[in-house]
């Protein structure tokens, strides 16, 4: 039930970190993967990992915040692969700061990538999914979109918006057998968290009932579930992958 044989998955922000882990996980389940990011060098690394699993991988320099770039990218993917069965909207950025000091540019930059990007990619890919009367859209949100966080007004607003947008898309597309769900990760281990002082890491872990950072694979496993037929009766939901931070 967790197989994606003969499926084509489009993953944004696929060059490294969580996006790379998701792309590899979907390939492990049998999917061919269209990899989207602006970092061509790191994107090729992800492509190599997918190809090593025996599956097709193609790279696309898509700027998710630009409508023309997204439209061209989706058209190219549909031409190259013939279809898109799974869309994972993972691309995201942060520009943290207290709201009192946050510039309008920093607000716009985060909302443009994190929220507008999900809107643009979903809008571009949904037409083909509706026509084939099947598809799974998985949007990467965050527990910050559920609980808020000081110093992250732009990020919290963008991820809260992703959650609301996911529910709306689920309602609009369910009659065409296209599902849309969101994943809300908590603190996930990255090179950035690894570089933090041990005391800082310990304080962060105190907020997590499971007392550890999540691994990228923890999130990728949930994405695979939502992308596969194992979740055929699941739509409009938010699955928190946060070690119990949000209950």
Name each region found by the language model.
Residues 127, 171-175, 232:
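Alpha-helical segment proximal to the catalytic Tyr-Lys
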Residues 98-99, 103-111, 193, 204:
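Substrate-binding pocket helix/loop in short-chain dehydrogenase/reductase
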Residues 142:
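Residue(s) in the substrate-gating loop at a strand-loop-helix junction
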Residues 40-41, 61-73, 104, 217-218:
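The beta1-alpha1 cofactor-binding region of Rossmann-like NAD(H)/NADP(H)-dependent oxidoreductases
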Residues 174, 179, 215, 234-236:
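Short, small/polar-rich loop/turn modules that mediate ligand/substrate recognition or access, typified
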């Amino acid at each position: 039930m967790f197989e994606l044989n003969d499926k084509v998955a489009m993953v944004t922000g696929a060059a490294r970190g969580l996006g790379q882990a998701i792309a590899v996980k979907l390939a492990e389940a049998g999917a061919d993967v269209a990899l989207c990011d602006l970092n061509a060098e790191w994107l090729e690394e992800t492509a190599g990992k997918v190809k090593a699993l025996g599956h097709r991988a193609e790279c696309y320099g898509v700027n998710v915040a630009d409508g023309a770039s997204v439209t061209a990218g989706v058209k190219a993917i549909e031409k190259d692969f013939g279809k898109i069965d799974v869309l994972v909207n993972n691309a995201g950025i942060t520009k943290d700061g207290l709201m009192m000091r946050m510039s309008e540019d920093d607000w716009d930059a985060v909302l443009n990538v994190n929220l507008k990007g999900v809107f643009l990619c979903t809008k571009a890919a949904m037409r083909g999914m509706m026509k084939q009367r099947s598809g799974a859209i998985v949007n990467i949100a965050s527990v910050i979109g559920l609980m808020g966080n000081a110093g992250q007004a732009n990020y919290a607003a963008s991820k809260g918006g992703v959650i609301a947008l996911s529910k709306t898309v689920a309602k609009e597309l369910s009659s065409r057998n296209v599902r849309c769900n969101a994943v809300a990760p908590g603190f996930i281990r990255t090179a950035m968290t690894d570089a933090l002082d041990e005391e800082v890491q310990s304080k962060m872990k105190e907020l997590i009932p499971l007392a550890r950072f999540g691994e990228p694979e923890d999130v990728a496993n949930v994405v695979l579930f939502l992308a596969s037929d194992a979740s055929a009766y699941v739509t409009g939901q938010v699955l928190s992958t946060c070690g119990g931070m949000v209950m």
